[in-house]
Each structure stands twice: as structure tokens, then as C-alpha cells.
Amino acid sequence: MQDLFLAKVESAMQASQVGALAGQTATVSSVSATTNLATITPTTAGQAPIIVKLDAARQVTELQALMGKTVLVGKTPTTIGGIGNWIALTPAAGAKTGAAVAGTGQLVMMKVEGTGAAIKLPALAGKSFIVAQPPVAAGTKAAGMLYLNPVGGGDMVAINIQNAMTQTGGLVGKTFTVAPSPVIGGTTGKFLVLKPMATGVGKAVGSGAVVAKFVPAAVTGTGGAAAIGAGSATTLMATGASTITPVTAAAAGSAMLTAKGVGLGLGLGLGAWGPFALGAIGLAGVVALYTWARRRHGAPDVSDDALLAAVGEE
């Protein structure tokens, strides 16, 4: 039996009436193949039945399989791109409690554009992603794409979404699990359904950035930082999408992590992490860090002028 039933209904009023029961149980009392009308009756005494009109014959058939059964009513899904009004029902057998359903976030639904995008959906179902900021060049507009970074690592997934440019910005930095796509007509679902995760690898902060986890380099017996090779499992930052080490980043042509930057880091006694320190705390901070390290090991101080002169020669 399916875990989640999503149905497109005739009007926003019908969707809101069903959504008002979120977290409660109800019974699918009747489903008519002639009129496409379905009756959903709350199990709580004193509440009136709700009648909705389903959009497609296929959904009538699917809901008929739940007739006479108890379902948990979910919140009205948030829809993007003018894709109509939807309701969410979950078969009660083996499902979460009503309180848990009421406490979860709303589903987010959007329609994909093109056969290629629709074909991707089944493979994404059940997997978790962090919505990424569109990689847009300066002076250009974002294409109608939604970018998803797999939680735990992997290649970024780009999906063509209807009206994605203007309505998906609020999703950036948030973590979702992809739910199975409802099929309205034909045999392929054309709707991307995102289910908010209660807890994720990252948490949205500020403008939607994902909190990065810092993993320090291993410390050697001499007090220095052990070199981390390109193939090491240890990473500087882990956002669920990519791994970065100072050497591999420099090899990739980063403006900050050039050979000069690596050489400067080695000269300051910071090893290959020197360029990252320069980018994070600036030259003045590196000077202070270098002075502290020398004092800790009993080495004589070096004047600021001498150190800055050495930097200028790099």
C-alpha cells in the first residue's frame, strides 16, 4: 500500500477544508467514477463530511483502493507555478501518529518541464537533498532550474521546473526528501514533491546558507599540521555536496589558492592550510597567528616589518 496519496482537487476551498483536518484521521467514505466526487469523513464525532472533486480518472481509481479505510490527513501542500490545488492523505496502517503528521512541515510541490526532467523523478524518490543556490554568472538571470545537492555527497542534480526563477528562492539551504510523484495522466509523474526533513545534515541560516562542519587537520608530533592528500577522507568543509582540500582546490585554479598562496602559507609555517587562513582571517590575522606559534615554541619574535617584507617578496 502506498505511503502517501496526493490528489488534485477542483478548488482551493476544497483543499483548505481537507487541510483543516491536518493531523486527524478520516475515512474515505465514497468515491464515484462517474462524477469524480469523493467523500472524506472525519472520525471525530460532530465533524461534517467533506466532498471533493478529483481532477483525473486515474486518481479516482487510486482513491477507490482506500475506500472504507482510515487515513491520516496531511497539511495542504504548498504549490509552486500554478499547478492547482492538492490534498495529502496517508493510509493509517503503519503510518505516523496524528500528532506527528500535524507537526511536520508542508509538502512543496512543483511541476517539472520536459520529458527528460520527468524521467529523473523516480530515481530521486526517497532520497534527501539540500536545495542549492543557482550557479548564475554575473549579469545574467537564473534559468528555470532547481539545483539539488545530495545529502551525504554526490553529484548535483539540476531539474527544469515550471516558474522556478521567481518562486523557489525561499527553498535554498533547506533539506528535503523527495516523495513519489503523483501521476495525473499517462504513466509518468510530472510533479516534484519535496517533503521537509525534521532534522538534516545542515541547517538554514542567514540567507539560506548551509552550516558547514569544520574538520581540523591531524596534528603531528612536532606540533605541525599533517598534510591531507587529495584522496583523504578527511575534509575541510562538508556541506553534503563536495569536499575541499587546500592542494586540490589550488590545482583546480582557485583565485585564492594559487601556487603563490600555497608558498606563502608554507613560508608562514602554516603548511598547505596557509591560503585558507589568509582567506578566512586576512593577512593581519595570519601575522598574529604566526607570532603566537613562534612564542609557543620558544622561537625569537620577528618584527612586523620583516614579516611583511617577506610577504611582499612572494
From Swiss-Prot:
Residues 289-314 are lumenal. It is found in: Magnetosome membrane. Residues 1-267 are cytoplasmic. Disruption phenotype: Deletion of any 2 genes encoded in this operon (mamC, mamD, mamF and mamG) decreases crystal size regardless of the protein combination. Deletion of the mamGFDC operon leads to smaller magnetite crystals in irregularly spaced chains, but no other phenotype. Deletion of approximately 80 kb of DNA, including this operon, leads to cells that are non-magnetic, lack internal membrane systems, grow poorly, have reduced mobility and take-up and accumulate iron poorly. Induction: Part of the probable 4 gene mamGFDC operon. Residues 298-314 are annotated as: Magnetite-interacting component (MIC), binds Fe(2+). GO terms for cellular component: magnetosome membrane. It is a single-pass membrane protein. The chain crosses the membrane at residues 268-288. Residues 263-270 are annotated as: GL repeat. Its main location: membrane. Signal peptide: none annotated. Keywords: Biomineralization, Iron, Magnetosome, Membrane, Metal-binding, Transmembrane, Transmembrane helix. Seen in gels as a band of about 7 kDa, suggesting it may undergo cleavage. One of its GO terms (molecular function) is metal ion binding. Belongs to the magnetosome MamD/Mms5 family. Helps regulate magnetite crystal morphology, probably in a single growth axis. Plays a role in regulating magnetite crystal size. Probably binds Fe(2+). The isolated charged lumenal magnetite-interacting component (MIC, residues 298-314) binds Fe(2+). This bacteria makes up to 60 cubo-octahedral magnetosomes of about 45 nm in diameter which contain membrane-bound crystals of magnetite (Fe(3)O(4)). This is Magnetosome protein MamD. It comes from Magnetospirillum gryphiswaldense (strain DSM 6361 / JCM 21280 / NBRC 15271 / MSR-1). The gene is mamD.
